[in-house]
Amino acid sequence: MADQNYIHAKDAYNTLCTALDNIGWKYKRMDDELKIMFGVNGDDLAMNFLIIVDADRQLVRLLSLLPFKMDENKRVEGAIATCVVNYLLADGSFDYDLEEGNILFRLTSSFRESLLSQELFHYMVSVSCHTIDKYNDQFLALNNGDITITEFIEKNS
């Protein structure tokens, strides 16, 4: 079964690479690990992505760590803001590390007993870029004291 899972994962990985090639994106392949890294310039902050094809769990995970940490005195507000945003999202979520202040965007799709299309990968990348670009500057503004948690909530209600 493990060999079959790896073959299925390798197919998903190759489809993902083809999808990125077809939209003309530059990326770094890590074929042995079934991982891809790439970056995108957003409206305000750069976004770095790691896509992992997990053969054992039959998942594709798209991850993007925001390029700043919430300051220690803003961590509780960061947790509240993350909950507010996650409530609004249909696909993907922001994971928040209260201890470290890190915010990580994650979008996952299963390929167990199914095939993932190039269109799905385009969607995953597109929705991730849009979502991160929409909220990363708001999280940063909250961290920098440019907006209050009340203003953050009002803007996203």
Please report, for each region that a protein language model flagged, where it lies by residue.
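Amphipathic alpha-helical segments
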Residues: 6-27
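Ser/Thr-rich, low-complexity intrinsically disordered terminal regions
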Residues: 23-47, 53-60, 67
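Short, surface-exposed coil-to-beta transition loops
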Residues: 45-48, 89-91
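Short, internal acidic amphipathic alpha-helical interface segments
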Residues: 65-102
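A generic structural motif
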Residues: 66-70, 109-116
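Long, contiguous binding/interaction regions
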Residues: 115, 122-133, 141
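Short, highly charged C-terminal tails/helix-capping segments
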Residues: 140-157
